[in-house]
């Protein structure tokens, strides 16, 4: 039973440290890319050191991983994109 609680607690901690999402430009829109992973990685690391990023081919937008909890990312429910 103790091991089960430990595993559940570990997954909860991993979720806290592994925020992901689309970074936003100044206009509140997702940052577009054309399958250029290096560009997206640079964009993600410029905003949040230690993060990683890639070009998400389905949405043609940069996607960042390993973000800090306070990182502001694009939210489809609260879309502020004016472009």
UniProtKB/Swiss-Prot annotation:
Q: Which SMART domains match?
A: Knot1
Organ and tissue specificity:
Expressed by the venom gland.
Q: Which Pfam families match?
A: Toxin_3 (PF00537)
> Which regions form coiled coils?
none
Q: What does the comment on domains in this protein's record state?
A: Has the structural arrangement of an alpha-helix connected to antiparallel beta-sheets by disulfide bonds (CS-alpha/beta).
The molecular function GO annotations come to: sodium channel inhibitor activity; toxin activity
Where is the protein localized?
Answer: Secreted
Q: Which residues form the LCN-type CS-alpha/beta domain?
A: 19-82
One BP annotation, GO: defense response
**CDD domains in the record, alphabetically?**
neurotoxins_LC_scorpion
Report the record's disulfide bonds.
Answer: 29-81, 33-55, 40-62, 44-64
Keywords assigned by UniProt, alphabetized: Disulfide bond, Ion channel impairing toxin, Neurotoxin, Secreted, Signal, Toxin, Voltage-gated sodium channel impairing toxin
Signal peptide, first to last residue: 1-18
Family listed: Belongs to the long (4 C-C) scorpion toxin superfamily. Sodium channel inhibitor family. Beta subfamily.
Q: Say what the protein does.
A: Beta toxins bind voltage-independently at site-4 of sodium channels (Nav) and shift the voltage of activation toward more negative potentials thereby affecting sodium channel activation and promoting spontaneous and repetitive firing.
Q: What InterPro entries does this protein's entry cite?
A: LCN-type_CS_alpha_beta_dom (IPR044062), Scorpion_toxin-like (IPR003614), Scorpion_toxin-like_sf (IPR036574), Scorpion_toxinL (IPR018218), Scorpion_toxinL/defensin (IPR002061)
Q: Which organism is it from?
A: Rhopalurus junceus
Q: Which SUPFAM superfamilies match?
A: Scorpion toxin-like
Entry protein name? Putative beta-neurotoxin RjAa10f
């Amino acid at each position: 039973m103790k091991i089960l609680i430990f595993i559940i607690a570990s997954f909860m901690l991993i979720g806290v440290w592994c925020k992901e999402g689309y970074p936003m430009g100044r206009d509140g829109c997702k940052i577009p890319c054309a399958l250029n992973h290096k560009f997206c990685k640079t964009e993600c690391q410029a905003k949040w050191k230690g993060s990683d990023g890639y070009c998400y081919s389905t949405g043609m937008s940069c996607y960042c991983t390993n973000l800090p909890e306070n990182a502001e990312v694009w939210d489809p429910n609260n879309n502020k994109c004016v472009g």
